[in-house]
Every structure is written in C-alpha cells, then in structure tokens.
UniProtKB/Swiss-Prot annotation:
<keyword id="KW-0719">Serine esterase</keyword>
<feature type="active site" description="Nucleophile">
    <location>
        <position position="135"/>
    </location>
</feature>
<keyword id="KW-1015">Disulfide bond</keyword>
<feature type="site" description="Transition state stabilizer">
    <location>
        <position position="57"/>
    </location>
</feature>
<dbReference type="InterPro" id="IPR029058">
    <property type="entry name" value="AB_hydrolase_fold"/>
</dbReference>
<dbReference type="Pfam" id="PF01083">
    <property type="entry name" value="Cutinase"/>
</dbReference>
<feature type="active site">
    <location>
        <position position="189"/>
    </location>
</feature>
<feature type="disulfide bond">
    <location>
        <begin position="185"/>
        <end position="192"/>
    </location>
</feature>
<feature type="site" description="Transition state stabilizer">
    <location>
        <position position="136"/>
    </location>
</feature>
<keyword id="KW-0964">Secreted</keyword>
<feature type="signal peptide">
    <location>
        <begin position="1"/>
        <end position="19"/>
    </location>
</feature>
<dbReference type="InterPro" id="IPR000675">
    <property type="entry name" value="Cutinase/axe"/>
</dbReference>
<feature type="disulfide bond">
    <location>
        <begin position="46"/>
        <end position="124"/>
    </location>
</feature>
<comment type="function">
    <text>Catalyzes the hydrolysis of complex carboxylic polyesters found in the cell wall of plants. Degrades cutin, a macromolecule that forms the structure of the plant cuticle. Allows pathogenic fungi to penetrate through the cuticular barrier into the host plant during the initial stage of fungal infection.</text>
</comment>
<dbReference type="InterPro" id="IPR043579">
    <property type="entry name" value="CUTINASE_2"/>
</dbReference>
<keyword id="KW-0732">Signal</keyword>
<dbReference type="GO" id="GO:0016052">
    <property type="term" value="P:carbohydrate catabolic process"/>
</dbReference>
Length: 223
C-alpha cells in the first residue's frame, strides 16, 4: 500500500462526505456504536453466537458507525439475548497512521482481537464465533485469525468490507477456510486493489452489511 488520498480535495458537498453522512444517519437508527457483551457477559448464560467486529479507521466507539452496527442489528433477528456483540477497542484505536504498518494495522490491535477471540472460547466454549471488519478493521481480523491456533476452528464465519489486505492476501485470510470467508469489495474501492487510495466506493457497504453479510453468517451459525 503506497498511497493514501483520504484528504484529497474533500469538500463539504463531495460524494465522499455525502456518503459518509448518509451512512452515519442510517446506521444510527440500527445499533449502538459501543458493544461489549462478550466482556460483560456471564459464562452461565452463553448466547447462540458471538460476533466480534473491528471498525474502520477514525470510526468512533468500538463498533464504528457503518458496517459493524448494521451486521450486529441484522444478527439480532435471533433475539437480542441470543447474540453477544463485541467490538475491538482498547489498544485498537483505529488511527490512520496504522494503515501504513506491515499488515495494515498495529500489532497491539491484532493482539486485542486475539484476546477477545480467546475470551469467547474460554467463556463460552460451545458457542460459535463469527467475525467481521471494515476498512482497517479487515486488517485487524486478517492479522488476528491466523494467530488463533485451535480457537480458529471455532470462528465459523467471517465477513470483510473494503478489505485493505485483499490483494496482499490473495482475497483470503492465511490458514482460514475460504468457504467460511466472505469479502465485499465495491467496484471502484481501490483499497481492495492494494492501495490506500480512498474513493467514495469505500463508504458504500451498508447494503451488504445489512443484508448479504449477516445472512452468510447466519448460514454458518445455523438455525
């Protein structure tokens, strides 16, 4: 990734700004931006499934305001008490400079995601885990999942939106079954092509996050 053009001539009425505002407004109707059910939940009341999600760069909370809340809201069709939603926060600050690091994010962010996956396995060893990430959050998941060893088999489905390591990782995640992974790359989203050039397409994943992606995860979780 050699380029970064997020700030290039973005005016108040630019397509990128308008897309961001529209996405933010729509998603605010769906779900909170901070979710910590895994960390707060009790092993005596494990849910049907656990979702761990990593937000995109500069997004607030630990879920962000776009893809993460949309996926979580759709999965709650099982029942709000049947899904634990956990955002990757703490050491993962979703800062812009970390996009330039090897692997597209910081090691501390990856380690935090690994910690959460391991906590899910320890707290609810019979509960399937699903995962997701948007923008830099996709790099967090791509870095964390290969480090899970035995726990990796418990991650039954993963969805990635605007995968910043898409080209570098050959559209996959190392040591993770391709059939358990769904990558969403909008036409014109250049981060999926191995660059850090940000176009308006990078902000257009709400439809996938609210529909096809959670449906894929549901197919992996089961009825």
């Amino acid at each position: 990734m050699k380029f970064f053009a997020f700030s290039m001539l973005i005016g108040e009425a630019s397509p990128i700004v308008l897309a961001l505002r529209r996405t933010t407004l729509e998603v605010r109707q769906l779900d909170p931006i901070i979710r910590s059910e895994l960390e707060q939940g009790s092993s005596s009341s494990c849910p049907k499934a656990i979702l761990i999600f990593a937000r995109g760069s500069t997004e607030i909370g630990n879920m962000g305001v776009s893809a993460g809340p949309a996926v979580a809201s759709a999965l709650e069709a099982y029942g709000a008490d049947q899904i634990w939603v956990q955002g990757v926060g703490g050491p993962y600050t979703a800062d812009l400079p970390s996009n330039f690091l090897p692997g597209g994010t910081s090691q501390s962010a990856i380690n935090e995601a690994v910690r959460l996956f391991n906590e899910a396995n320890t707290k609810c060893p019979s509960t399937p885990i699903v995962a997701g990430g948007y923008s830099q959050g996709t790099a967090v998941m791509a870095g964390a999942i290969p480090k899970l060893d035995a726990v990796r088999a418990r991650v039954v489905g993963t969805v990635l939106f605007g995968y910043t390591q898409n080209q570098q990782n050959n559209k996959g995640i190392k040591d993770y079954p391709q059939e358990d992974l769904q990558v969403y790359c909008e036409v014109g989203d250049l981060v999926c092509d191995g660059t850090l050039i940000i176009t308006v397409s990078h902000f257009l994943y709400l439809e996938e996050a609210a529909g096809p992606a959670p449906e894929f995860l549901k197919s992996k979780i089961g009825a």
